Amino acid sequence: MAGRGFSWGPGHLNEDNARFLLLAALIVLYLLGGAAVFSALELAHERQAKQRWEERLANFSRGHNLSRDELRGFLRHYEEATRAGIRVDNVRPRWDFTGAFYFVGTVVSTIGFGMTTPATVGGKIFLIFYGLVGCSSTILFFNLFLERLITIIAYIMKSCHQRQLRRRGALPQESLKDAGQCEVDSLAGWKPSVYYVMLILCTASILISCCASAMYTPIEGWSYFDSLYFCFVAFSTIGFGDLVSSQNAHYESQGLYRFANFVFILMGVCCIYSLFNVISILIKQSLNWILRKMDSGCCPQCQRGLLRSRRNVVMPGSVRNRCNISIETDGVAESDTDGRRLSGEMISMKDLLAANKASLAILQKQLSEMANGCPHQTSTLARDNEFSGGVGAFAIMNNRLAETSGDR
């Protein structure tokens, strides 16, 4: 990547590094603010709970003529049993086949509720290697799901946009029949907005959470709010473990419930993962806007350099080049690959296998264009694409949304 820098700072800070440092600083501030809010909300409740527990412990010790040390020793034994999966109420076995299957599901999905953990040395060693392969495979699965989801959403929204143009008479019927005229078609540069995609994913996530909560509330005995809370914690793979579904020994229609629980968690994790990646585009736009505001006081030469074509960056719409050329991703220069390797994004298989010039995003875009009847066009402006065939989830959404396209 070109070493364009910002004038503030002694060494003309590289743009990618400036964005990385700005994001790191904002995350630290976000953590400090979150800690302050949670401390204000939860600290008093924690102190009250501790006071109630000390009173109950003293009353029980006096009522049964037990010393506090003896009672605490017994409670430590119970804590050890709890870590091994033993509960006061009757719960399902943790390490039969179905319990172990639930456990490996929480491992590879990175949810990690924590209600079941390996206790043997062999189990802990196996978990390290099992999780290394399993978590990597699941991340790949989520990325492939995101790729197909973005393609489907873009196809549906483009079809709706075409129908609207036809009804208004802005799009002749014949223009869509001739595949050779795709490059001059009125929709050649049209892409769905990331805001609409975010709204669709948010609606889908809420719908799945509400339906799952309606199932958990009567079966698990949770309140509806607690069920919604569990859905977010599980679907986002935070996985605190304070609430865990399908842990009782017996349920009505047990097989059906466990299957539905698996399906809801799988769908929820996929949707929330996709939503997080779409939101990250908006966060990156905001970072670029902040960087431009911070650099607005620079000399005119620096400002002209700031407005030049950017690589590997999502720019707000107010300063994007609004040409109508559809920019592809397969003409990216090798310098872009080097820049991405230095940026805050993950390195893709394209970077690891230099001989393979077609990345996941390029293949996906080519397939989409073939499905739409448009021949693949290689543009000389590809090296100026703002995502330049990026990597990871960014590569999947590259040039598929209006805000990730270099032609805006």
Swiss-Prot record:
A molecular function GO annotation: outward rectifier potassium channel activity
Membrane topology: Multi-pass membrane protein
Modes of activity regulation: The channel conductance is activated by arachidonic acid and inhibited by Ba(2+) ions, volatile anesthetics such as halothane and antiarrhythmic drugs mexiletine and lidocaine. Insensitive to extracellular pH change.
Subcellular location: Cell membrane
One annotated GO biological process: regulation of excitatory synapse pruning
Catalytic activity, reaction form: K(+)(in) = K(+)(out)
InterPro entries: 2pore_dom_K_chnl (IPR003280), 2pore_dom_K_chnl_THIK (IPR005410), K_chnl_dom (IPR013099)
Region feature Selectivity filter 1, mapped onto this chain: 110-115
Tagged with keyword Transmembrane: yes
Binding positions for K(+) 3 per the UniProt entry: 112, 239-240
Residues that coordinate or bind K(+) 1: 110-111, 237-238
Regions of this protein lying in the Cytoplasmic compartment: 1-19, 146-193, 284-408
Assembly and interaction partners: Homodimer. Heterodimer with KCNK12.
Domain notes: Each subunit contributes two pore-forming domains 1 and 2 which assemble to form a single pore with M2 and M4 transmembrane helices lining the central cavity and M1 and M3 facing the lipid bilayer. The transmembrane helices are bridged by the selectivity filters 1 and 2 that coordinate the permeant ions. Up to four ions can simultaneously occupy the selectivity filter and at least two elementary charges must translocate across the filter to convert it into the open conformation.
Name of the featured protein: Potassium channel subfamily K member 13
Originating organism: Homo sapiens
